[in-house]
């Protein structure tokens, strides 16, 4: 896939000036139309050229209406993020329907970790499967994903870094990480190809952008976003599905798992007290052990017996230390919550 972005695509100054004004207007108009749509737009910018990716993020913030765009740059995970599920910071950055999120960074860091031996092949495969699952959830919920991978050949990157080092005007853009990344670029290539293949899904393919020429790069990125968004906005809203009332007619006898629950089960009070005390003591010690090991536990309670759920929760929390748990009641989604995935 990367070879397709090494053919020498360029855009002259005159060509650039001819297409940019209309392209910018089209991008902003598409953003305005998106405001009334029932889906969000997520633009993912990744690549093996950090400087190019940074420039593209800045360019999109210049060309698009930032009132309806939120940019999230994912650097090294903070201590708080390391204590959370692996994609927690992505969950927090999801846009509501009708808005756009620009995500940058994070993906190539995982590739570098594989190349440097910090992450095993098995761990990388697990990470990919979780990322595929998240992508599938977003697509099934209607999100439009535009995924851009910026590629600059190692030879061109090396020449650019050398020029920047000599020139005071551009030298500040370069840091030691860029030189270190350049040394592992060839080793990273098969890992990148694997990531791009695994994460290319129907409706959400990767667009590999040749980033050597900045004019070609910026126009290609903006045009890809514009074309994907306008095409999606032009689609007819899905027609409602007619469902026969017979589907909801009560059957003579519906056997489910709940039909087999023994509602007459009970304990004598003395036996209940003894067993409850023993189990609460065991739960208390397990919770302390989990705290020391950094193990997180989520308990989900569902059912039509609200008093029963509340009673169970109270008896569990009685055995825990107050700082170790949080009870979160979940009601029907609010209108604001319904705007998000």
Feature annotation, model-predicted:
Residues 1-341:
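Glycine-rich phosphate-binding loop of ATP-dependent small-molecule kinases
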């Amino acid at each position: 896939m990367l070879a397709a972005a090494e053919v020498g695509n360029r855009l002259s100054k005159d060509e650039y000036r001819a297409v940019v004004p209309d392209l910018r207007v089209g991008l902003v108009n598409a953003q305005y139309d998106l405001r009334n749509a029932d889906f969000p737009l997520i633009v993912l910018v990744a690549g093996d050229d950090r400087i190019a990716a940074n420039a593209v993020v800045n360019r999109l913030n210049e060309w698009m209406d930032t009132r309806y765009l939120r940019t999230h740059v994912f650097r090294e995970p903070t201590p708080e993020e390391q204590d959370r599920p692996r994609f927690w910071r992505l969950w927090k950055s999801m846009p509501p329907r009708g808005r756009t999120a620009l995500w940058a960074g994070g993906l190539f860091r995982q590739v570098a970790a594989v190349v440097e031996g910090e992450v095993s092949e098995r761990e990388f495969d697990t990470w990919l499967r979780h990322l595929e699952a998240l992508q599938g959830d977003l697509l099934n919920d209607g999100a439009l994903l535009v995924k851009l991978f910026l590629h600059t050949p190692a030879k061109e990157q090396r020449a650019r870094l050398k020029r920047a080092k000599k020139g005071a005007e551009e030298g500040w853009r370069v840091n030691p990480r860029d030189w270190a990344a350049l040394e592992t670029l060839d080793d990273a290539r098969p890992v990148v190809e694997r990531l791009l293949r695994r994460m290319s899904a129907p409706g959400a393919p990767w667009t590999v952008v040749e980033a050597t020429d900045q004019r070609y790069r910026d126009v290609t990125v903006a045009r890809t976003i514009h074309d994907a968004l306008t095409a999606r906005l032009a689609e007819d809203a899905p027609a409602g599905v007619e469902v026969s009332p017979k589907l909801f007619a009560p059957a003579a006898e519906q056997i489910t798992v709940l039909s087999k629950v023994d509602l007459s089960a009970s304990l004598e009070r003395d036996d209940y007290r003894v067993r409850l005390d023993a189990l609460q003591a065991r739960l208390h010690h397990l919770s302390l052990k989990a705290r020391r090991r950094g193990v997180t536990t989520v308990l989900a309670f569902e059912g039509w017996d609200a008093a029963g759920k509340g009673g169970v929760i109270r008896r569990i929390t009685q055995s825990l230390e107050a700082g170790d748990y949080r009870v979160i009641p979940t009601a029907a989604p609010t209108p604001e919550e319904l705007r998000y995935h």
